[in-house]
Swiss-Prot record:
<dbReference type="GO" id="GO:0004553">
    <property type="term" value="F:hydrolase activity, hydrolyzing O-glycosyl compounds"/>
</dbReference>
<dbReference type="GO" id="GO:0008933">
    <property type="term" value="F:peptidoglycan lytic transglycosylase activity"/>
</dbReference>
<dbReference type="GO" id="GO:0009254">
    <property type="term" value="P:peptidoglycan turnover"/>
</dbReference>
<keyword id="KW-0456">Lyase</keyword>
<dbReference type="GO" id="GO:0071555">
    <property type="term" value="P:cell wall organization"/>
</dbReference>
<dbReference type="InterPro" id="IPR010611">
    <property type="entry name" value="3D_dom"/>
</dbReference>
<keyword id="KW-0961">Cell wall biogenesis/degradation</keyword>
<dbReference type="Pfam" id="PF03562">
    <property type="entry name" value="MltA"/>
</dbReference>
<comment type="function">
    <text>Murein-degrading enzyme. May play a role in recycling of muropeptides during cell elongation and/or cell division.</text>
</comment>
<dbReference type="GO" id="GO:0019867">
    <property type="term" value="C:outer membrane"/>
</dbReference>
<dbReference type="Pfam" id="PF06725">
    <property type="entry name" value="3D"/>
</dbReference>
<dbReference type="InterPro" id="IPR036908">
    <property type="entry name" value="RlpA-like_sf"/>
</dbReference>
<protein>
    <recommendedName>
        <fullName>Membrane-bound lytic murein transglycosylase A homolog</fullName>
        <ecNumber>4.2.2.n1</ecNumber>
    </recommendedName>
</protein>
<dbReference type="InterPro" id="IPR026044">
    <property type="entry name" value="MltA"/>
</dbReference>
<dbReference type="InterPro" id="IPR005300">
    <property type="entry name" value="MltA_B"/>
</dbReference>
<dbReference type="GO" id="GO:0009253">
    <property type="term" value="P:peptidoglycan catabolic process"/>
</dbReference>
């Protein structure tokens, strides 16, 4: 949410409104903390919650990934990781965390009453071909480095109009929308339709022009009501408009993202560690250090994205960053493909967060 590394994903993980600045957020999608919190992190003695952690196994796997792929990050947090794993193995009663010598820090949230923003991002799978043919006519570009040194890179509209040399084309997809979403997410797996392994395209750079949220544009134009804005609402708008109208909308966002083919087969965050779905997050590293363990109280949604007035407790690790992930905001990595895209599109809610570390 440095992101040159595979999920730069979030220099541009601006997905929900195609920007994580979200035009509309209802504070009632979270809950109110009774006592006002002043500091970013307030040390507390105990978390009075009896629910169990639902992702203990995934948390263990994520810690092992850190140990293997970033030994230095693991060493910085080794005591915390080992203590939390010991706690999970014994009983994982949240109200007993302090008995294991773990410091507990309540985050003040965006409103000073504990409400932190919860959103999601994912890795898309894009159908593409090496050669332009039939519906596969939308170029995915590599970074034109020679232009970057000598002159400003073209705006999105100019790139759509073919101003870049064809030698920079990595592949052709069959959907301009998929290309745009790929840019927003910062990376994607490419399916060439040959029954071979998917190829990972990671973030290579951008053209340097300012990003503009298409969700906000649609709200400003009155195409979608502010209260109804969601990824699903944007998709519905797409189905009712022509390719030309969709392209015109995209062109209002002059920012453009370039990619590079990589040999890596896992999705990495800014910490150079493979991300485990629903156990890794992008966070603001001016508040949350990379490798930090966060206990999240997350809203539970139904299959239509409706908040059920229930919460689940999940342990996550801050392994990613994002240009739009600022302050008391966590962007949860949801995984790869369609199911992950739906879930990440629904999350625009509030929860609670506690930072855990060994005393």
């Amino acid at each position: 949410m440095q992101k040159k590394i595979i999920k730069t994903i979030i220099f541009f993980s601006l997905f929900f409104l195609f920007e994580k600045s979200y035009a509309y957020i209802n504070i009632n999608q979270g809950q109110q903390y009774e006592k006002k919190l002043i500091q970013n992190l307030t040390k507390i003695k105990q978390i009075n919650i009896k629910k169990k952690i639902i992702n203990a196994e995934s948390f263990y796997i994520q810690v092992e990934k850190i140990k293997k792929f970033s030994p230095s990050l693991y060493l910085k947090n080794e005591s915390t990781y080992k203590t939390i794993l010991k706690w999970l193995k014994k009983n994982s009663n949240i109200n007993e965390l302090n008995e294991f010598g773990i410091n507990l820090f309540q985050m003040k949230g965006i409103d000073n009453y504990g409400n932190v923003k919860i959103t999601g991002y994912y890795t898309p799978i894009v159908q593409a071909r090496k050669i332009k043919k039939n519906n596969f006519k939308y170029p995915i570009y590599s970074m034109p480095y020679h232009l970057k040194k000598n002159e400003p890179l073209p705006k999105r509209k100019d790139i759509y109009n073919g101003v870049l040399d064809k030698k920079y084309i990595l592949a052709y997809s069959n959907s301009l929308i998929d290309n745009f979403i790929m840019e927003i997410q910062g990376s994607a797996f490419i399916d060439y339709g040959n029954k071979k392994k998917l190829i990972f395209f990671s973030y290579a750079g951008k053209n340097g022009w300012p990003y503009k949220s298409i969700g906000q544009i649609l709200i400003n134009r009155g195409d979608i009501e502010k209260k109804n804005m969601s990824m699903q609402a944007i998709n519905k708008w797409f189905t009712k408009h022509t390719n030309k109208e969709i392209q015109d909308l995209f062109e209002k966002n002059e920012s453009f993202v370039f990619f590079k083919e990589t040999k890596k087969k896992q999705v990495y965050g800014a910490s150079a560690v493979p991300l485990i779905a629903q156990t890794s997050v992008a966070a603001d590293n001016s508040i949350i250090k990379k490798g930090s363990v966060i206990l999240l109280k997350i809203p539970i949604l139904d299959q239509n994205g409706v908040f059920l007035n229930k919460y689940e407790m999940r342990l996550v690790i801050a392994l990613d960053v994002g240009g739009a992930i600022k302050g008391h905001h966590f962007d949860i990595y949801e995984g790869i493909g369609t199911k992950a895209s739906i879930l990440s599109g629904y999350y625009n809610h509030y929860g609670y967060a506690w930072i855990l570390n060994k005393k």
